């Protein structure tokens, strides 16, 4: 199988992205109990969203490679979503479309790949072991299958620790966008050993 060329994405300058600046800061104060009714209500409000989309800055950093890009994430239904990675000029480097039982990925040369597991396919084709199946929940501020997590003083996720398939992911939320209801994550960082994934969301559209 031909391998897609992601060199353009890897060579994008870090200066083209603003991953650390964010107008929303994490609330200070002691964390709240995961058993609190406020947290249960927040989770339910997020799960009630039928459609949503967000765009922003993405970075994957490891000893082997550094990838910087813009991203666009759109969920249109249960297990139906679209992920775009683009360079600063707006050209698409990767497009992924997923629906139940079928995932299609198109690289920057127009080569099309098909599989039934998006996480596995992205890992094989890009060399980035992104925990996409869990990230679909984490990016919404939901713990997914994780049971080890902490809340901030506004009853929202502040930190997750999750182990699966030999990976030990730690997720730290840097703030929330309170312009949307419910409030959605504004930036987050995932770490596993020597690899890091950073996401900064510019805005959210939720329905």
Curated annotation (Swiss-Prot):
Main location class: membrane
Keyword Protein transport: yes
Alphabetical keyword list: Cell outer membrane, Chaperone, Lipoprotein, Membrane, Palmitate, Protein transport, Signal, Transport
Family: Belongs to the LolB family.
GO BP: lipoprotein localization to outer membrane; protein transport
Signal peptide feature range: 1-21
Residues with lipidation of kind S-diacylglycerol cysteine: 22
Listed name of the protein: Outer-membrane lipoprotein LolB
Gene Ontology terms: cellular component: cell outer membrane
Gene name of this polypeptide: lolB
